[in-house]
Amino acid sequence: MRYERLAPEAIPGALRDLDGWSLSEQGDAITKEFSFDDFAQAFGFMTECAIIAEKMGHHPEWFNVYRRVDVRLTTHDVGGLTGHDLKLAAAMDQVAKRRV
């Protein structure tokens, strides 16, 4: 599947529709830190998101320490952000809301 890179002027509006996501310093990715009650909640979040990401064919860069999960989303094939990143970010937000 081929994805179109988002125009730089479209990114601020797209971020307004997401909860707590930020544009990376390089401007080629969005990032968010998720925080949970404990490691089991954090790992459960990652497990559920991994299944969604696999079905989408789009995989996050992420890092987990205890109850925190740091996520970075970008589309490597186009060297920047696409609608696919926004879709996965929204799905991850929904998973996190169910785990609070």
Curated annotation (Swiss-Prot):
The keyword Lyase applies. InterPro entries: PCD_sf (IPR036428), Pterin_deHydtase (IPR001533). GO terms for biological process: tetrahydrobiopterin biosynthetic process. Signal peptide: none annotated. This is Putative pterin-4-alpha-carbinolamine dehydratase. Pfam families: Pterin_4a. The keyword Lyase applies. Keywords: Lyase. It catalyses: (4aS,6R)-4a-hydroxy-L-erythro-5,6,7,8-tetrahydrobiopterin = (6R)-L-erythro-6,7-dihydrobiopterin + H2O. One of its GO terms (molecular function) is 4-alpha-hydroxytetrahydrobiopterin dehydratase activity. Its EC number is 4.2.1.96. Belongs to the pterin-4-alpha-carbinolamine dehydratase family. Gene3D superfamilies: Transcriptional coactivator/pterin dehydratase. It comes from Allorhizobium ampelinum (strain ATCC BAA-846 / DSM 112012 / S4).
